[in-house]
Amino acid sequence: AYGTAKKSAYTGSASVIKADDIEGRMVTDALNALSGTMAGVQVSNASGGQPGTSPTVRIRGIGSIFGVSTPLYVVDGMPFDGDIATLNTMDIESMTVLKDAAAAALYGARGANGVILITTKRGKEGDATITFDARLGSNTRQIKGYETITDPAMYYEMAYNAMRNGYLATGSDAASAHLQANNALYDAFGKGYNIWTVPAGQLLIGTNGKLNPNASLGKVYGNNYVTPDNWYDGTFCNGLRQEYNLSVTGGSERFNFYGSVGYLKDEGIIKGSDYARLSSRIGVEYKAKKWLKLGSSIAYNHIKMNSPSGQDSGDYNSSANAFAIVDNIAPIYPLYVRNADGSFQRDAFTDNPIYDYGDGLYLRNSQRAFMSGANPASNFIYDKNEGLMDVLDAKWYATITPIENLNVTGTVGYFLDNTRWHILGNKFYGAFAKMGGYAQQNQSRLRGLNLQVLANYRKTFADIHHTDYMLGYESYDRNSESLSGMGLNLYMPDGWAINNTLNNAQRKTSGGSTTYTTRGIFGRVNYDYDSRYFASVSYRRDASSRFHPDHRWGNFFSVSLGWDAAKEAFLRDYSWIDLLKVKASYGQQGNDNLGLAYAPYYIDIYAIEGSETWADGNLAQKGNPDI
């Protein structure tokens, strides 16, 4: 972002992945294209299986124990605080990962965890070239569940033996333990369900610990028929991934352009989860004068996602987590409520099958021993967790060349992210049925303004002393706003708006606003002697609003050396050695990303509570002025 360098002359540690490698992978988030391609870069995805979820990226391990270890993302020279998944991977020319202090020290207070530079495509001189790309794929759960018991008969036999041994251990005789264990298989303190039809006067499990050979799977309870279902098949699916991109590029010696539109629909492995992205980008560059070049790059992306809540690894104990339910539920429980003839009972409004929550509501005296009141497959149909994003990323720049080898570039970058979430907990089934349903609206807006001035000068002395000088100034201002509201007791069953709730006393709202500002001046000097010996020195003085006014400025530097032994006389005759480089670097980096949700740690924070005209303020955080 702060200039370019040849690989042979570069003294820092960096790795690059080009467009061909990125496009060769069917990934929704460009960061997944880094997986397995670079030493020292770890890419891991959340376990929830939601399409469009950005992976966790760690460059040379964890950079902070208590702070955030996320690297800094820079898109076309400007810090990018949005979701990388909003970028169309087909618009990316290259991604460069800066790993060490020599490479990242120039980024000051934000570069401690490494830097990922993303360069988007630009126009190329020549006739207009139109490219259309269409891709189809499938998403499948690759990591299967643990080897568990899937046969209902085997499960009942093991459960019987465990209970029988328990009764024997507490003093029951063999006959009593046998009878007690059989009865306990069905009650609420055992497994809660009897899914077998056994002839009158007989027990399900014999004294030999095996299933009664006269038992048949399936049992009628009044108007209901009970039989186990495959929860895996009822919860997971193979999702279709489809992507279409159209781009046009071309230009002349003085003018070039690049434009693209794209559409992506990525269905998840959990029923009801998907991610849709409509993307567009246009970039132009015009050489107005021999000494003046103007350019701009504007991208607008619209995203719509359905993301069932409670599916991440941190929610594994949640009753909404499909992975937890499917991995742990016994193979004896029904997924659906059935009529006595075995057909599905259907919802009167949607005609969808009615799901069994294991709470005894439909199947009297049958209460599931595991996760009673939960059925994630039903939640995927009747609940809503819909996210909408509109993202604008725009840059305008001008480069002047007042004298030979001196370029001065001024850039203005503007970023806007409007995100809305519509959340609905249905009023008929599940956790929110007793409340009459639940509705929530969340809205957030993130705005960023970046101003940057860079001066680059190159000079060669005596044909072997190559020097490169860079001096720059950068300011970044970010503002984020959020507003959230929720209510209970829905009027319209499918309405997610708060004004669709009838219980005014239970309506709640919350909101907030934060600002974040950085200022920095920086410079770098590169020296190259005869393409054999290299040296680089960089310095940045940075200020961050996250620290106390007395401690906001910090100094960051790096020194690096390099030697390409392949250019020495004693190795020049070895044609199979084209680069043999030894590098060493030392530097200091900063990390102002402390994971602050609302306000800096250096100020006192009071929580305002109460619903009357006068409310109390309780001290929630005691500020530390030394930060």
Predicted regions and their residues:
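Short, small/polar-rich motifs associated with maturation and membrane association
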Residues: 1-281, 286-289, 293-295, 301, ...
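Outer-membrane beta-barrel transmembrane strand signature
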Residues: 184, 190, 195-249, 254-260, ...
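A surface-exposed, glycine/aromatic-enriched loop/edge motif typical of exported proteins
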Residues: 145, 149-211, 301-364, 477-493, ...
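Short clusters of hydrophobic/aromatic residues that line enzyme substrate/ligand-binding pockets
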Residues: 10, 22, 59, 106-107, ...
